[in-house]
């Protein structure tokens, strides 16, 4: 750093998702599942298509829509609401909730590898039961 300069982050805590340490702005933000984002974007696309003065959707919009279509784990509102409700009952941080629902890991070990903040907070059996419940909900969607 140049002499006389100051680091604008000085005094700020270093963010670390593995420790659930996020920037201040994230404290009031809510997380969305990829499936929820997909439904919102699809709705916006349909609105645009049915409008009298249909506008071309941006490249970023279309890329995001395609991404969320590819990585959406849940295909309908009922399943999304059910999975979100299930995960809200657990003592999960909103970041962990979104990660579990978006990634849908199959084992507790895989979950802890992908989401390190789960380590030490959940027993493998408890975490496996959550994952099994999510998988059951996925298997019953249309």
UniProtKB/Swiss-Prot annotation:
Pfam families: RNA_pol_Rpb4. The keyword NADP does not apply. The keyword Nucleus applies. It comes from the Eukaryota. GO terms for molecular function: nucleotide binding; translation initiation factor binding. Component of the RNA polymerase II (Pol II) core complex consisting of 12 subunits: a ten-subunit catalytic core composed of POLR2A/RPB1, POLR2B/RPB2, POLR2C/RPB3, POLR2I/RPB9, POLR2J/RPB11, POLR2E/RPABC1, POLR2F/RPABC2, POLR2H/RPABC3, POLR2K/RPABC4 and POLR2L/RPABC5 and a mobile stalk composed of two subunits POLR2D/RPB4 and POLR2G/RPB7, protruding from the core and functioning primarily in transcription initiation. Part of Pol II(G) complex, in which Pol II core associates with an additional subunit POLR2M; unlike conventional Pol II, Pol II(G) functions as a transcriptional repressor. This is DNA-directed RNA polymerase II subunit RPB4. It comes from Homo sapiens (Human).
